[in-house]
C-alpha cells in the first residue's frame, strides 16, 4: 500500500524558508505587508509542497467571522436571476461587497412557514450579516435573524424594524407621475395590476380589506399612491379593478393580465406596480393582435433596462444603487461603524411611449 500523500502546512513552509508562520500567513491574508519577491517565493514553495492555502473553516473559528454576507429574499433563485430589478439590486450588493463573499438565502414567502423552520434556515447560513430584500411584515425569518444576533439591513420592506436600517424610495409618492400620466391623457377606466400583497396566496381580484391589511407595503403603497391620483381626478375607487399576481414570473404575469383585460374589456389603461407585470400585459395584447398604446395605455414601475429599451412609460428607481447602499451599510454595521437609520432613494418618471390620449 502506498504512503498517504503529505501536504505542506504553514509551519513546514516556514521551516523550509527559515521564516515565521506569521510571515507565511501574511502572504495569503495581508500581502501588502510583504515585498512582492518574498510573497512570490512563499507562494512558489507552498505550491511545491502541495499547500492549498488557509483553511476557511479554521479561519472562521479563529476570527468568529464567516467572511460572507447574505441576502434574504422570499423568492426562488430562478426569480433572483430572471427579474431584472432583482438582478440590478444583487449587482449593487455584490459591488459593495467587493472581496466579501455573497450568499443568497432564498426563503419561502408562504404563510405556512413557521418560526422553527425559519430559524433553522437562518442558523444554517454561514454569514456575518444579512440584507433583507423585500420581505413581508411579520415574516418569521426576520425574527430568526434578530434571535441569532446578526446585523441586518432592510431594502424595500418591511419598513422600520427596530435596529435595522431601512433603504427604499417613497413608493406612494413615486408612482404618482405614472398615474397622473394616465389621467392627463384622458383615461378614466383604469385597472391596476400588483404583485404579491400578502403572505397568504392570492391570484386574481384584490379586496379592499386585503389591500388595507397588506403585509407587503411596497405594493400596497404603490396601489394607494395611484388611487389617490385617480380619486383626485374624480374616479370612484370602487370602479377601479385591482388584480394581484402572487408569483412574479412571465407565465403568471401573462395570466393575470389576461384575466384583468378579459373580465374588464372596457378598460382603456392599466397601471402596473412593476415593469414585469407591464410586460405580461404587452405579451397578452400581442397574443390577441393588439398593442400599447394603440389599443391600451400602460405604465410600469422600476425602470429596468428592458423597460427602457421598450420605451415603457414607467417610474425609474435606482435598483443597483439600492443594492449598493444596502451592502455598504451592512458592512459598516459588521465593522461596528455608524450608519444612517433610514435612506430614502430618489426616483424619476420616464414618459416613454406606452400612454396615448383616449
Curated annotation (Swiss-Prot):
Activity regulation comment: Myo-inositol causes the dissociation of the IpsA-DNA complex in vitro.
Stretches assigned to coiled coil: none
The HTH lacI-type domain, residue ranges: 8-63
A family per Pfam: Peripla_BP_1
GO terms for biological process, alphabetical: cell wall organization
Molecular function per GO: DNA-binding transcription factor activity; transcription cis-regulatory region binding
Observed phenotype of the null mutant: Deletion mutant shows growth defect and altered morphology. Mycothiol biosynthesis and phosphatidylinositol-based glycolipid synthesis are abolished.
Keyword line: Activator, Cell wall biogenesis/degradation, DNA-binding, Repressor, Transcription, Transcription regulation
DNA-binding region(s) from the entry: 10-29
Function: Plays a role in the regulation of cell wall biogenesis. Inositol-dependent transcriptional activator of ino1, which encodes inositol phosphate synthase. Also regulates other target genes, which are most likely involved in the synthesis of inositol-derived cell wall components and mycothiol. Acts by binding to a conserved palindromic motif within the promoter regions.
Quaternary data: Homodimer.
Protein name: HTH-type transcriptional regulator IpsA
Amino acid at each position: 500500500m502506498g504512503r498517504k500523500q503529505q501536504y505542506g502546512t504553514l509551519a513546514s513552509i516556514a521551516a523550509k524558508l527559515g521564516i515565521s508562520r506569521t510571515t507565511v500567513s501574511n502572504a495569503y491574508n495581508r500581502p501588502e505587508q510583504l515585498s512582492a519577491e518574498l510573497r512570490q517565493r512563499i507562494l512558489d514553495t507552498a505550491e511545491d509542497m502541495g499547500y492549498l492555502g488557509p483553511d476557511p473553516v479554521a479561519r472562521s473559528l479563529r476570527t468568529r467571522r464567516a467572511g460572507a454576507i447574505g441576502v434574504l429574499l422570499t423568492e426562488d433563485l430562478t426569480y433572483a436571476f430572471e427579474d431584472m430589478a432583482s438582478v440590478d439590486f444583487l449587482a449593487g450588493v455584490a459591488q459593495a461587497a467587493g472581496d466579501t463573499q455573497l450568499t443568497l438565502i432564498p426563503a419561502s414567502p408562504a404563510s405556512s412557514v413557521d418560526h422553527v423552520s425559519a430559524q433553522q434556515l437562518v442558523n444554517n447560513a454561514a454569514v456575518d450579516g444579512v440584507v433583507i430584500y423585500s420581505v413581508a411584515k411579520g415574516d418569521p425569518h426576520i425574527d430568526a435573524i434578530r434571535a441569532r444576533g446578526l446585523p441586518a439591513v432592510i431594502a424595500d420592506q418591511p419598513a422600520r424594524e427596530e435596529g435595522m436600517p431601512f433603504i427604499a424610495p417613497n413608493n406612494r409618492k413615486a408612482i404618482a407621475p405614472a398615474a397622473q400620466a394616465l389621467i392627463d391623457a384622458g383615461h378614466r377606466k383604469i385597472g391596476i395590476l400588483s404583485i404579491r400583497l400578502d403572505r397568504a396566496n392570492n391570484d386574481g381580484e384584490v379586496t379592499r380589506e386585503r389591500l388595507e391589511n397588506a403585509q407587503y407595503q411596497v405594493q400596497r403603497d404603490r396601489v394607494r399612491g395611484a388611487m389617490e391620483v385617480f380619486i383626485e381626478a374624480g374616479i370612484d375607487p370602487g370602479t377601479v379593478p385591482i388584480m394581484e399576481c402572487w408569483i412574479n414570473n412571465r407565465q403568471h404575469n401573462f395570466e393575470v393580465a389576461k384575466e384583468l383585460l378579459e373580465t374588464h374589456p372596457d378598460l382603456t389603461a392599466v397601471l402596473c406596480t412593476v415593469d414585469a407585470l407591464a410586460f405580461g400585459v404587452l405579451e397578452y395584447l400581442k397574443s390577441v393582435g393588439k398593442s400599447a398604446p394603440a389599443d391600451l395605455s400602460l405604465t410600469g414601475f422600476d425602470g429596468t433596462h428592458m423597460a427602457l429599451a421598450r420605451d415603457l412609460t414607467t417610474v425609474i428607481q435606482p435598483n443597483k444603487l439600492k443594492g449598493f447602499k444596502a451592502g455598504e451599510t451592512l458592512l459598516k454595521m459588521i465593522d461596528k461603524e455608524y450608519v444612517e437609520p433610514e435612506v430614502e432613494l430618489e426616483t424619476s418618471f420616464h414618459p416613454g411611449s406606452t400612454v396615448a390620449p383616449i
